[in-house]
């Protein structure tokens, strides 16, 4: 994905480089439980404006969303409004959600909306059809084209429409992503769950978490029970999007901020299933919470 600062839009950026396979490889990708051999067809009207909500429900795979000849406006990240931003290619990490507004051309046609797997030549998607009965073009689930890795290109351009009130942090928690260690272990701050050492917060605090990722791949980091704002990427502060899942790419650093206003014990983990079950997990615990029932080994 590339950003054109003149046209102010996202599009494909093509690069030559060494192919790096992910540590888990699939044989197919699905959109609404269907492959591109028989994709879902959504009938629309010429000139109509539609909203498409994308949900990355995969256990592992991140995606590039490809609108083809159409252009969309990104309106929401993880259900939180952002200043609208245009493009034909968008990034979507595991557990994230994106809401796009797309206006169909006045000329009837068939318009595939594709989701390409990260570091993969597999794809899936749905089809918008404004020409009833028009023959579907062939859409191969697997191609000769491979994609690269997700990065900060998209989040660097996004601005929250309802940002957090300006406030200094009361509590800063460093989180160094760790792995892969022997026996396919992944962790946080060189520790591998289960252990009983939560990230402590107090009611009403402005909390910041500072992520660094020296691992060879990106990690979608998800905090339960809270929405946070991305406030810094690679040392550059900004008023970024509100989210509940942030993708921290290989070699990347970012800072998130949230207000601790939901007392309890909340899971915090990489949303790649194979990573959090191998140790990239902990909990955020309020000092006021009852921890007697929390059993990390269970």
Descriptions of predicted regions:
Residues 1-49, 55-58, 180, 186:
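Acidic-aromatic/histidine active-site loop/patch
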Residues 196, 218-226, 234-236, 247, ...:
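Substrate-recognition/cap regions that form aromatic- and gly/pro-loop-enriched pockets
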Residues 56-73, 222-228:
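Short acidic, flexible loop segments centered on an aromatic residue
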Residues 55-60, 212-216:
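Short solvent-exposed strand-capping/beta-turn motif centered on an Asx-Ser/Thr pair
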Residues 67-94, 231-245:
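Solvent-exposed beta-strand/loop surfaces of large extracellular or lumenal domains
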Residues 46-53, 205-211:
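Short beta-strand elements of extracellular/lumenal beta-sandwich folds
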Residues 1-6, 82-218, 238, 259-265, ...:
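Extended terminal and domain-junction accessory segments
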Residues 40, 88, 96-100, 244, ...:
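Short strand-edge motifs at loop-to-beta-strand transitions and within beta-strands
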């Amino acid at each position: 994905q590339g950003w054109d600062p003149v046209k102010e839009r996202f599009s494909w950026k093509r690069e030559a480089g060494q192919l790096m396979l992910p540590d888990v490889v699939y044989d197919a990708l699905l959109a609404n439980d269907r492959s591109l051999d028989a994709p879902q067809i959504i009938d629309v009207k010429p000139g109509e404006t539609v909203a498409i909500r994308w949900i990355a429900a995969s256990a592992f795979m991140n995606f590039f969303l490809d609108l083809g000849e159409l252009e969309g406006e990104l309106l929401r990240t993880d259900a939180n409004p952002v200043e609208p931003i245009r493009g034909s290619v968008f990034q979507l990490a595991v557990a994230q959600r994106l809401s796009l507004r797309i206006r169909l051309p006045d000329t009837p046609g068939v318009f595939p909306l594709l989701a390409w797997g990260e570091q993969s030549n597999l794809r899936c998607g749905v089809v918008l059809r404004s020409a009833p009965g028009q023959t579907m073009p062939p859409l191969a689930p697997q191609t000769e084209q491979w994609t690269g890795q997700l990065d900060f290109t998209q989040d660097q351009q996004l601005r929250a429409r309802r940002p957090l009130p300006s406030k200094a942090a009361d509590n800063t928690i460093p989180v160094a992503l760790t792995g892969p260690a022997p026996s396919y272990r992944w962790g946080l701050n060189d520790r591998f769950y289960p252990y009983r050492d939560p990230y402590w917060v107090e009611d009403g605090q402005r909390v910041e978490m500072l992520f660094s990722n020296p691992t060879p791949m990106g990690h979608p980091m998800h905090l339960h029970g809270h929405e946070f704002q991305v406030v810094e990427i690679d040392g550059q502060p900004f008023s970024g999007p509100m989210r509940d899942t942030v993708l921290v790419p290989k070699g990347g650093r970012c800072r998130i901020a949230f207000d601790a206003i939901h007392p309890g014990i909340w899971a915090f983990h990489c949303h790649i299933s194979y990573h959090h079950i191998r140790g990239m997990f902990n909990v955020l615990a309020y000092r006021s919470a009852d921890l007697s029932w929390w059993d990390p080994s269970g």
